[in-house]
């Protein structure tokens, strides 16, 4: 049960950090004519 909790915390933390960096800096991926 603890493994599931730790995994959830790890994934959520990485997600928050990823979105924070992603929204702080504009994405540097070339736009191929589509959203």
From Swiss-Prot:
Highest rank taxon of the organism: Eukaryota
Major localization class: plastid
Keywords annotated in UniProt: Chloroplast, Membrane, Photosynthesis, Photosystem II, Plastid, Thylakoid, Transmembrane, Transmembrane helix
GO cellular component, one term: chloroplast thylakoid membrane
Compartment(s) of residence: Plastid, Chloroplast thylakoid membrane
GO biological process, one term: photosynthesis
One Pfam assignment: PsbT
Membrane topology, record value: Single-pass membrane protein
Presence of the UniProt keyword Translocase in the record: no
Segments traversing the membrane: 3-23
Family: Belongs to the PsbT family.
Assembly and binders: PSII is composed of 1 copy each of membrane proteins PsbA, PsbB, PsbC, PsbD, PsbE, PsbF, PsbH, PsbI, PsbJ, PsbK, PsbL, PsbM, PsbT, PsbY, PsbZ, Psb30/Ycf12, at least 3 peripheral proteins of the oxygen-evolving complex and a large number of cofactors. It forms dimeric complexes.
Role according to the record: Found at the monomer-monomer interface of the photosystem II (PS II) dimer, plays a role in assembly and dimerization of PSII. PSII is a light-driven water plastoquinone oxidoreductase, using light energy to abstract electrons from H(2)O, generating a proton gradient subsequently used for ATP formation.
Name under which the protein is recorded: Photosystem II reaction center protein T
Species of provenance: Cryptomeria japonica (Japanese cedar)
Origin organism lineage: Eukaryota, Viridiplantae, Streptophyta, Embryophyta, Tracheophyta
Gene that encodes the chain: psbT
């Amino acid at each position: 049960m603890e493994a599931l909790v730790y995994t959830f915390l790890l994934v959520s933390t990485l997600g928050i950090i990823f979105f924070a960096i992603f929204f702080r800096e504009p994405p540097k991926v070339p736009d191929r004519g589509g959203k």
